């Protein structure tokens, strides 16, 4: 019995020895691996705080410590090659590392250009970063930019650099879909990137900038949160001007409803941006005072507005942007000013609005209607007030 107890103690002691928190000051970019090796075997480090300048070589180092991977070809038949990023370590094709890093703190790190490629991103034919695509490109660091897949690893908590001024699309990748619980984005960043937390399943805490101008496409798409989820803000700030396509599409399960009660300062809402937001909770919602199609119509992903949000005059509701809205009072408020009706905008709420929508007093002077805006409702006879009605 004593022997069994002794072995148990030794085993427990061994586990402690393999769990290490390391603080590293990188004085010369590209030497993170050397600095870590001074303190511990990289395979045993589960918590890492990096101080100083880091380049692509250093990013590659901590990604290896966090079980990051390169993409693997899953179908090389014929002329078509498909690439895919593995979801969770060891569950799909591709090699994994022996790293154990879970906690990554880059708050005092400065990203600088140079060093090796730290990842290979997968793109579709439209040059949009995806999880499965036709071709790949190597990723290199830029000064003060958190690049795509730069934080890709099986991490549970990630703190972005305080010095970062921009975050590119899909910075955390897909490896941490199940493991990531906490994320902190610094105040120095004004725009949340595309696919920031796309498909993450167990989030417990998100810290966002106090001043925020934009939320990129699919930033919180299919996002699920754990019990006791919290954010550091009570609502999205008044500085928020645009929400990209599908930003809250599916999966968020009304978690973000309370944070979207006041969207009166927005200038752009992309396709399906609010698809999963439950409008029934918007009892005191402040809608924008002007809803109008500006000089540049957004593409399918709203990318024109994502990069140049001020090109649009006031506010556009693209197709299906408010698909989930069932409260006609909200639509009446929207319709008090000139507006653009996007494809599928009223689906599936139009039937309940038939009486009200026939009333021309609801509308402003200018109405732009896409050809499929009233799809499946061809029997509806609309009376349009004086002004311009454009059917595109």
Name each model feature, range by range.
Residues 1-4:
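Positively charged n-region of N-terminal signal peptides that target proteins for export
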Residues 18-36:
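Boundary/junction segments of secreted and surface-exposed precursor proteins
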Residues 35-41, 62-66, 88-97, 147-151, ...:
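Leucine-rich repeat
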